[in-house]
């Protein structure tokens, strides 16, 4: 199945209002990254076992692991989880960056080393979320 089709199906599989909000965030990210590589990870390992939430990815960077190996990965991830929605901002070396920069201003959200999780778009300052995404778009690798 084509990635764009998988993404549409992933969004459509969500109950309302999560579905509409996930679509709104997908549109927002694509507007910010119009020609980016798109990804879809179904959350299953090689044995078909569900190990993570299905994730839509945008953009790319080279991820370097502790053993020195590298892998291409998405810069921005969007997913639905039991708590609501999450935007993952990948490849940030400083694990406190998101917390320190956006934790106090984004609104009612849990901000971690690479993720911003919130129940609803209405609970957060969307301009601050856009700023966090834009910061990662502009950062090399």
Residue ranges and their predicted role:
Residues 1-141:
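Charge-dense, helix-prone N-terminal extensions
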């Amino acid at each position: 199945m084509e990635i764009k089709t998988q993404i549409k199906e992933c969004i459509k599989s969500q109950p309302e209002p999560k579905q509409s909000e996930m679509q709104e965030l997908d549109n927002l990210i694509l507007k910010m990254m119009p020609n980016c590589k798109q990804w879809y990870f179904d959350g299953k390992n090689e044995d078909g076992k569900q190990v993570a939430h299905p994730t839509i990815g945008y953009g790319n960077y080279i991820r370097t692991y502790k053993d020195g190996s590298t892998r291409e990965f998405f810069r921005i991830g969007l997913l639905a989880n039991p708590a609501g929605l999450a935007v993952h901002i990948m490849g940030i070396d400083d694990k406190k960056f998101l917390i320190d920069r956006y934790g106090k201003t984004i609104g009612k959200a849990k901000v971690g080393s690479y993720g911003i999780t919130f129940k609803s778009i209405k609970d957060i300052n969307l301009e601050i979320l856009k700023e966090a995404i834009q910061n990662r778009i502009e950062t090399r690798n």
